[in-house]
Swiss-Prot record:
GO terms for molecular function: large ribosomal subunit rRNA binding; structural constituent of ribosome. The gene is rpl14. Belongs to the universal ribosomal protein uL14 family. Part of the 50S ribosomal subunit. It comes from the Eukaryota. The keyword Transport does not apply. GO terms for cellular component: chloroplast; cytosolic large ribosomal subunit. HAMAP family: Ribosomal_uL14 (MF_01367). Binds to 23S rRNA. One of its GO terms (biological process) is translation. This is Large ribosomal subunit protein uL14c. It comes from Sorghum bicolor. PROSITE patterns: RIBOSOMAL_L14. SUPFAM superfamilies: Ribosomal protein L14.
Length: 123
């Protein structure tokens, strides 16, 4: 569960390394916590030098991994090693061209098919 002030890793090659959540947008109105597939507004806390994204930029991101376990549609409980997000634009397309690490199958149902297709492993 991701809430404001939570630090997240970035799971793509957009140039950012760490994000801090500042607002949960989500899909179900006024949510307090973000889960896998929810959209957040975040600020970049650490970035690779000489890349398009810089420190202290406010961006949108979708959660792809959380340390808090969740039950999948088939009843399997999944928990990841870190909290991670992929930076997206206003249309929901990823800004990077690669996605690192595994992502959840539930992203496909939430119309983030581009992120799922870029991921090396889908759980």
């Amino acid at each position: 569960m991701i809430q404001p002030q939570t630090l997240l890793n970035v799971a793509d090659n957009s140039g950012a390394r760490k994000l801090m959540c500042i607002r949960v947008i989500g899909a179900a109105g006024n949510q307090r916590y973000a889960r896998i597939g929810d959209v957040i507004i975040a600020v970049i806390k650490d970035a690779v030098p000489k890349m398009p994204l810089e420190r202290s930029e406010v961006i949108r991101a979708v959660i792809v991994r959380t340390r808090k376990e969740f039950k999948g549609d088939d009843g399997i409980i999944i928990r990841y090693d870190d909290n991670a997000a992929v930076i997206i634009d206003q249309k929901g397309n990823p800004k990077g061209t690669r996605v690192f690490g595994a992502v959840a199958e539930e992203l496909r149902e939430l119309n983030f098919t581009k992120i799922v297709s870029l991921a090396p492993e889908v759980l």
